[in-house]
Amino acid sequence: MTEPAFFAPARRFEVGEIAALTGARLRDASQEKITISRLAPAAEGGEETLVFIDGRRHASRIGSVRAAALLCSEELAENAPDGVAVLVSPKPQQAFAMVARLLFPEANRPQPVTGETGVSPRAVIAEGAVVEDGAIIEAGAVIGVGASVGRGTIVGPNTVIGARCSIGRDGYVGPNVMLQYAVIGDRVIIHPGAQIGQDGFGFLPGPNGFEKNPQIGRVIIQDDVEIGANTTIDRGALSDTIIGEGTKIDNLVQIGHNVHIGRRCVIAGLCGLSGSVKLGDYVMLGGQVGIADHITIGNRAQLAASSGVMDDVPEGERWAGVPAKPMRQAFREIAALRSLVQDMRKGSKG
């Protein structure tokens, strides 16, 4: 259930409006004036609340819905309780998310912690730094020599924007973030604790142990990227580390030097991408995926959670396992191993 103390609705929406905005069909047109100001899981609901149910797996819940309105598929709509305004959509969850973005626009991007506007008197703006009108720099933030922050961008408390870094417009850089040697596009969201542009892991064996291989590249983050809390992105050794437009990266992800990530990829938490890995466009990585250095993942490939990738993955394929292999092969091997173990147990009892 949405808590007004944290997320107050921009305004009330009528069910008829929601139908028009999402493309859903209101099953009973006489209910178009019912108002919505809250969102909740299907099991909760309540007055002025919209819920959704998506897929057969949750179909058993539909009879107990007590919300003002329900988004669901055509096949589930006939089982909805009387008195609930039913909005029929082929993609209920996507329609619900659209309503959430409209009802709670402040949730689309984190807001200033202190409520300040403009540049806080407790921020440090170095000589030659440029902060465009409309940017918000909160207390304790440091904007380095020659750095720039675009209009509408929020820089949170105790964040450091390194010398000559640039951040585009309408972005967000959360508290306790460190940016170095980085060029950031427009509408980029960087959550608290992320560390971007630090040294890549570059060392060479020498006569007295390992010697540092200087990392002299950059990090380039294109427009509309979102980076989760405590994620780390190393700068390139010679070439740049690049995060493509529209890519979404979860918390606690490690991206090594010279990695190139394509457009609109999704990378779940605890993934590790070694140096010089290349991901195509629309790649999806489940949680805890590890990719060895210099591996290439083709466009629209998908890697299951906890996969250990040691070979290139062709475009459009789905891989799983350690070492990762095509998903069907991985599942057949798991089934064969299970069968072998069962046979061995039977043999030992005989």
Curated annotation (Swiss-Prot):
UniProt xrefs under Pfam families: Hexapep, LpxD
Record family assignment: Belongs to the transferase hexapeptide repeat family. LpxD subfamily.
Catalytic-site annotation from UniProt: H257
Function: Catalyzes the N-acylation of UDP-3-O-acylglucosamine using 3-hydroxyacyl-ACP as the acyl donor. Is involved in the biosynthesis of lipid A, a phosphorylated glycolipid that anchors the lipopolysaccharide to the outer membrane of the cell.
Pathway given in the UniProt record: Bacterial outer membrane biogenesis; LPS lipid A biosynthesis
GO biological process, any: lipid A biosynthetic process
Assigned GO CC terms: membrane
Protein name according to UniProt: UDP-3-O-acylglucosamine N-acyltransferase
